[in-house]
């Protein structure tokens, strides 16, 4: 059975002590996990090693929020894929809209990072999404296609067989003031993303939805045919919130 991916990125939040408390509580709840759901957490760099160590006896995957494409070199302030592997990480989040808006991330650099992640055995979680302006001007589908193709553009034919994830996060739906996309809208966009990715990879890859996911909409979202998981923000920064959404989704998945 195909698993649903449900996880959270903490962005620039949580001290090491807070990260440990979250990971320990998640580990304590491990006995109640659903076999249908693949859980993951993406802490800040300062906490990845400790969180991975605490969760090492569970099925929870742990990732990083970004990385450079080079293995090493004169890239002050950057983190390399080798460093992430040295921390025993599983996933790396790439191309988030905040990185694109504030730090000069482009489709080209995302493509370089995706190739480096695959080469080093990391699962790239590729974030894509249109702005409100794109949406209102009718360019959403074109923007998403450009981002998907750019992210996959550096992969060799062999690398195209690697495990790859997409996360659709409409820019207007994320953040504290984000407006959640309707389940129908999200599902339609994700169908387009999956189709474009399949045209490049010759297979279907999972596409998660992220954008103001919360306990009130998670069940409707996870029931959509083209939503293969949820990438949760602030609703899951508290471990009780994450466990609540996991439980709601597990019940919905089992009912289907």
Curated annotation (Swiss-Prot):
Gene3D superfamilies in alphabetical order: Aldolase class I
Record keyword Repressor present: no
Family matches, as InterPro entries: Aldolase_TIM (IPR013785), TIM_sf (IPR035990), Triosephosphate_isomerase (IPR000652), Triosephosphate_isomerase_AS (IPR020861)
Keywords: Cytoplasm, Gluconeogenesis, Glycolysis, Isomerase, Pentose shunt
Residue numbers annotated as active site: 96, 169
Enzyme class: isomerase
Compartments where found: Cytoplasm
Pfam families reported in the protein's UniProt record: TIM (PF00121)
Entry's EC annotation: 5.3.1.33
GO biological process terms, semicolon-separated: gluconeogenesis; glyceraldehyde-3-phosphate biosynthetic process; glycerol catabolic process; glycolytic process; pentose-phosphate shunt
GO CC field: cytosol
GO molecular function terms noted in the UniProt entry: triose-phosphate isomerase activity
Claim: Cytoplasm is one of the keywords in the record: yes
Known catalytic reactions: L-erythrulose 1-phosphate = D-erythrulose 4-phosphate
Record-listed substrate binding positions: 175, 212
Involved pathway(s): Carbohydrate metabolism; erythritol degradation
Function per UniProt: Catalyzes the isomerization of D-erythrulose-4P to L-erythrulose-1P.
Subunit record text: Homodimer.
Protein family per UniProt: Belongs to the triosephosphate isomerase family.
The protein's name: L-erythrulose-1-phosphate isomerase
Lineage: Bacteria, Pseudomonadati, Pseudomonadota, Alphaproteobacteria, Hyphomicrobiales
